[in-house]
Curated annotation (Swiss-Prot):
It is a multi-pass membrane protein. The chain crosses the membrane at residues 5-25, 36-56. Residues 75-109 are annotated as: Disordered. PROSITE patterns: UPF0057. It is found in: Vacuole membrane. The gene is pmp31. This is Plasma membrane proteolipid 31. Its main location: membrane. Keywords: Meiosis, Membrane, Phosphoprotein, Transmembrane, Transmembrane helix, Vacuole. The modification Phosphoserine is found at S69. One of its GO terms (cellular component) is plasma membrane. The lineage of its organism: Eukaryota, Fungi, Dikarya, Ascomycota, Taphrinomycotina. Disulfide bonds: none annotated. It comes from Schizosaccharomyces pombe (strain 972 / ATCC 24843) (Fission yeast). GO terms for biological process: meiotic cell cycle; monoatomic cation transmembrane transport. Belongs to the UPF0057 (PMP3) family.
Length: 109
């Protein structure tokens, strides 16, 4: 058990009480590992063994804050240029009254 951190140790201890929660924390609650562990928990001991296996096999991943990383060379901020309003050329569109001149409620035969 190399590179077992304090959080891994606490998850292993917690897996003796609620192993499916440990698998949900480590792998996600909508994953196949979570559903497998729920089925194994019905059998008892295999659910605990599976939860300990998941904690050891999949170490905690470090989530990087990509948006607020000032030293990352792959993330560059480029400001958008000001959008200039182009002059409108051509005739004005027709008004609604010229398009809908007759009343649509009364239809003539």
């Amino acid at each position: 058990m190399s590179n077992v951190t304090l959080s891994d140790f606490l998850l292993i201890v917690l897996s003796f009480f609620v192993p499916f929660i440990v698998v949900g924390i480590r792998r996600g609650f909508c994953t196949a590992d979570f559903l497998i562990n729920i089925c194994l928990c019905a059998l008892g001991i295999p659910g605990i063994i599976h939860a300990i296996y998941i904690v050891i096999k999949y170490p905690r991943t470090v989530r990087l804050d990509i948006e607020n990383s000032p030293n990352d060379p792959l993330v560059r901020y480029t400001p958008n240029p000001e959008h200039a309003v182009s002059p409108h050329s051509g005739p004005a569109p027709p008004s609604y009254s010229s398009l809908a001149s007759n009343d649509n409620k009364h239809q003539s035969p």
